[in-house]
Amino acid sequence: MKPSIAIILCILILGVDSQRWVQFMKEAGQGSRDMWRAYSDMKKANWKNSDKYFHARGNYDAARRGPGGAWAAKVISDAREAVQKFTGHGAEDSRADQFANEWGRSGKDPNHFRPAGLPKRY
């Protein structure tokens, strides 16, 4: 099925008005950028035990964009964890990452996971 036909079906069947669909896609794009920014900051910071903070922060920022941002954060987070599981990385660490992801997406303060001494710019 062509993407354009799928979009039209969604609009007709689900009753999604076109402006809301455009807004959802805009939020998803912005949420994706929020997730990328958190990942980039995590790599730049290179701070021990900070990954859970950046997971929570990326999801938090993306979800604040709206339903599209929350959707993008979930898709990106789940894909990342699926890749880790496939490559054989620790299941326990993956569960902890998912907990931090859900914490951020639910609107809870990502600073709960902030490690001591992490520079304020992050």
From Swiss-Prot:
Function: Major acute phase reactant. Apolipoprotein of the HDL complex. In vitro exhibits antimicrobial activity against Escherichia coli, Streptococcus uberis and Pseudomonas aeruginosa.
Listed GO MF terms: chemoattractant activity; Toll-like receptor 4 binding
Biological process annotations from GO: acute-phase response; cell chemotaxis; cellular response to interleukin-1; response to bacterium; response to stilbenoid
Segments of this protein annotated with the region Disordered: 87-122
Higher taxonomy: Eukaryota, Metazoa, Chordata, Craniata, Vertebrata
Main location: secreted
UniProt xrefs under Pfam families: SAA
Induction of its expression: Upon cytokine stimulation.
Keyword Kinase: no
Family: Belongs to the SAA family.
Species of the source: Mus musculus (Mouse)
Gene Ontology CC annotations of this record: extracellular space; high-density lipoprotein particle
InterPro entries: Serum_amyloid_A (IPR000096), Synovial_Prolif_Regulator (IPR052464)
Keywords linked to the UniProt accession: Acute phase, HDL, Secreted, Signal
Protein name as it appears in the record: Serum amyloid A-3 protein
Entry annotated with the keyword Chaperone: no
Cellular location(s): Secreted
Leader peptide range in chain numbering: 1-18
Tissues of expression: Found in various tissues.
